[in-house]
Amino acid sequence: MMERTYGRRKPGMLNDDVSRAEHIFPSSSSPELEPVDFSTQESSCVWNYSSRSTFSDNDFSEKRNKRPRNGGGGFGSNSTLMEAQEFGELIENEDEVNFALDGLKKGHKVRIRRAALSSLLSICESQYQRRSLRALGISQSIIDAILGLCLDDIPSNLAAATLFFVLTTDGQDDHFMESPNSIKFLVKLLRPVVSASTKVKPRNIGSRLLSIIKDVDAARDAASMHDLSSCDIIDRAQEILVNCKELRLIDSYKIERMRPELSTKWVALLVMEKACLSKISFDDTSGTVKKSGGMFKEKLRELGGLDAVFDVVMDCHTVMESWVTHDTLSVEDIKDDLNKQSLMLLLKCLKIMENATFLSTENQIHLLRLNKSMGSHESRLSFTELMISVIKILSGLQLRAHRNEKHPHPQPHLASAVKKGFVTIISSDTCSTTGFSSIKSLSVSKRNQSAFLVGCSTTPKPGSQSSVMSTIDHCTLTTTAGSNTGSFAGRLASLGSGISRSKTRTSQTRESSCKKVENFASFEDSQDPFSFDLEDSGPSRWAVGKQKKSKGQKRKGSYRDKKDERSLQLFSSQEESNHGLNSQEESSDRDHHVTEQPSLTYDIDKGCLCLLSDCLLTAVKVLMNLTNGNSVGCREVAACGGLESMAELVVGHFPSFTRSPLYSQMESGTCHQKDKHLTDQELDFLVAILGLLVNLVEKNGINRSRLAAASVPITNPEGLQDSEQDMIPLLCSIFLTNKGSADTKDETSTFTLDDEEAVLESEKEAEKMIVEAYSALLLAFLSTESRSIRNAIRDYLPKRDMAILVPVLDRFVAFHTTLDMIPPETHKVVMEVIESCKLP
């Protein structure tokens, strides 16, 4: 049997005179052995060409026929060049993995550990390489080494979390995630302990001033993330997550460099979210839906995983409370990346809670019993209270954003902005007579102007335009934290001044990406008086592609650019200080100038609103799972104000239902509300709210009475209370507005997929049927509580007849019965409600 060994070649060993035949073959005269008639890069220095001359063509063919084909190791003479190259790459990867695993052993320094993890990230970058490692049985060795790491270094933690994610979610055994070691490792990633003995370089005056504002650990963490090895790990981790389409498809964000998602907690939560997904199997023969899969959710609860996720939600809630407390946020109070990362972590935690409570009564009970103290306060907050508080905060932020989009307010003058602690951007564009001066974004605060002046470098570079600092009297700027600076804190918390991201062509934008810094540097180097505009001064993609520059040099240059930029931005974000992850905006072809007149338009950041909407929808789904067939959960949610909160969500986010006319006007055709087409996000949100209300009133008479008597205040576009809306007319309005034409339409009518109008109409009808069914079920449950409530509902229905609900409820029950998704006791209750609706 031929046995091929692989050895790492050193430079200068291509022509070495080694006994290759003895190294590869036990004996050159063995009948089992044969030379291979191809030449590759690997074989150019391995195969002994002198031994090939001892064989003739006849001998070679004779030995080839005698050789048994048992599929053993090595290559036969019929191996192709591609197969040989692939085999060489496999062996090379195996060798690289072994070297990297040696670097992960205990006792090595942090820099060695980082280098080893960076090497493993590069090896596991593509799915093909990961499959090859799994085929060789090496992936399990990598996972075992990662589970035994000491999590005392932030970059190493990020690399370990990324490797664990990509190796466990890419075809790994499902039951592997249920092991205690895996779950404990994920919990440790959510609660990392950074060693205080980590040695860092002496900090400069800027870092020392920064430590006054923040804690010493934050400054040390920032220093640990700003070296070349950390940047290399961040780049490789981001590339893997982008290739897995996690950054783009899950959070609906553009691919950016140094995104806030690139944190250890976010990746660990991502792994938990994937593992908590319950697998649903559909039986083709019976048409039933059943749950299948492992027990990761239960193991996660038993080993403290849900408690750790609850702690992360508490931290995010603390940050969100500060958004409500501060009408206008100063740069020292809340940093940009902290807000962005808080929402992203919150979304992942809510996804985990949603998946963990789905079809798991034990997890529902465990979360309902959870309560933690609120920091230094003596009061304790239960999980239900926490979720309702999160829903209220998110709803308020989203509603203010929409109001500011429709009714923007003028931006305040710079003097008032500085007085209120706004973030101010001073640009040399308006203070210099030269049109090519570079833009330097400087953060100014009221309390730390002296620290700002110390941290800024005002020495101009030779042959370049310097950034000019002027007073308010010389330069009239109109930038605020809520609109033009691009600050996430201003976009979310200072919603009274408008939510905006730095996308408007008429506003000043903070330059935070390395691409912009590189453009300025290239212009300063060229100094061509006939050069084009700044955005065209950078090298083209073809020019960059032709430059033969190593990855290390590229990362080094990028690191230096980012370091120069940080020196001009003393008050960086929380993520930059703790993790060094510099969130950068994807550059686009637009002008960046400061307007001399106040801007009256606001460009609402769609990405931020989408993130808020996702968090709000998922939080409602968590409560819906907690109350699904759980009487304790229904009592807890109702006791914490869940009924009133859901009613406020309907009124606030769907104001059109409060303005719907009476049913007589709907029948006459004067109402245009039926033509409204809900978006997928709005439809899911409305259905989740109605589903939660159905769970709350299904088996609880007290909740039925409270919901029927509820009255929700209606606010005007300025945010002031205008009137009140009773719940019964509101629910009847939802039902009548979404009542489809399924009862009158000929079911035998068909349409083709080419008919676009027919397809869209069918889609609208399907959406209406879903909302119609849940609203009808909710009205039917309320009608069974008392005669007065039943009469109140009849007053808002056509012909004062409750029988209009019966066909809708029959279709609802038939659908869920077909899929076997309705419990027997629930089916019995619904059938009794349907019979009651048939009574006069």
Swiss-Prot record:
Biased composition (Basic and acidic residues): 558-567
GO biological process: cell division; DNA repair; embryo development ending in seed dormancy; meiotic chromosome segregation; meiotic sister chromatid cohesion; meiotic sister chromatid cohesion involved in meiosis I; mitotic sister chromatid cohesion; mitotic sister chromatid segregation
Source taxon at top rank: Eukaryota
Domain named WAPL: residues: 764-819
Compartmental location: Nucleus; Chromosome
Keyword 4Fe-4S tagged: no
Expressed in which tissues: Expressed in roots, leaves, buds and siliques.
The keyword Metal-binding is assigned to this record: no
Start-end of Basic residues biased regions: 546-557
GO CC list: chromosome; nucleus
Polar residues bias spans: 569-585
Family as reported in the entry's similarity comment: Belongs to the WAPL family.
Protein's job: Regulator of sister chromatid cohesion in meiosis which negatively regulates cohesin association with chromatin, acting as an antagonist of CTF7. Cohesion ensures that chromosome partitioning is accurate in both meiotic and mitotic cells and plays an important role in DNA repair. Essential for the prophase removal of cohesin during meiosis thus determining the timely release of meiotic cohesion. Important for proper spindle attachment and assembly during meiosis. Helps to prevent abnormal centromere association during prophase I in meiocytes. Required for early embryonic patterning.
Protein name (Swiss-Prot/TrEMBL): Wings apart-like protein 2
Organism: Arabidopsis thaliana (Mouse-ear cress)
Gene behind this protein: WAPL2
